[in-house]
């Protein structure tokens, strides 16, 4: 074999050894997206529900941001608030699409990044729907979760690999008796959850987590080429909110400013009030946030606020299965309540 042919052969072999594993990994990831996006997953572009295409003439597009309550944890994508809201508005003969950009564990800090990531959807109005995931109110450890940005592939291309998350959530389901929310609580608070899974389930979960770690390792290698800036909230005290809500308020204000600067309308929504002492804290948080909005933006016509705090009684098991996340009927109530404010804001 001539030196030239030998080099060609070596180059081809190296190319195959690199391309083939990535192609196989991509094919497996696309399969997992297809399998899980209709239940508890997301599509290849990182949002829940069907992929939306170029906005049509006369169509209004709405996006909904938030954490697991907006995402629709525990229900199908059709039963989540965004899909039901779309159906409510369309039933009046209006052309509208509502895209679910929420993600489990995310709080107000993520809003600005998500609004930016999905500008290409050409949305007209953004609904900001999250307070629960910022109730810790600890300025030393705010909720900096921006789940999609943990993937260098998403940051570079907009494609969100799902297989590490699917494997990790499957493992968590085995360890936490089917309650993957405990995994996210542990990630958010740092408090370890004691579980009593069987040895067999622990072994299976360990294997799944090991597989997820392989995917994470590949992404970390890619991440070295496009490192993510260290998360921070600039000048939280500028929000004017009292302790411990300054970081939360500033994150909401930052998102609203970003949206207005890009010609978007924004609807900020208070979620159903939590029960007991958590509810008292939730109401205090929301009152501080609303006051900050009014101080900063006054009578801005492209911004509206809606209080859905009393729309759903979270102690009613027919409407909420865990006193936080809603059942399909609970989500339907919120969607019905939001339809009017959304239509009014789109008409401005």
For each of these PLM feature ranges, what is it?
Residues 248, 319-348:
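Histidine-centered active-site loop/cap adjacent to the catalytic His
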Residues 31, 179, 191-193, 338-348:
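Short, hydrophobic alpha-helical segments
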Residues 78, 82, 86, 108, ...:
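Extracytoplasmic/secreted envelope proteins and their assembly/folding machinery
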Residues 133-294, 313-317:
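Serine-dependent acyl-ester chemistry module
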Residues 45-104, 112-127, 331-332:
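Serine-esterase "nucleophile elbow" of acetyl-processing enzymes
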Residues 100-102, 270-271, 307-309:
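Residue-level recognition of beta-strand->loop/alpha-helix junctions
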Residues 1-63, 75-76, 94, 109, ...:
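N-terminal secretory targeting modules
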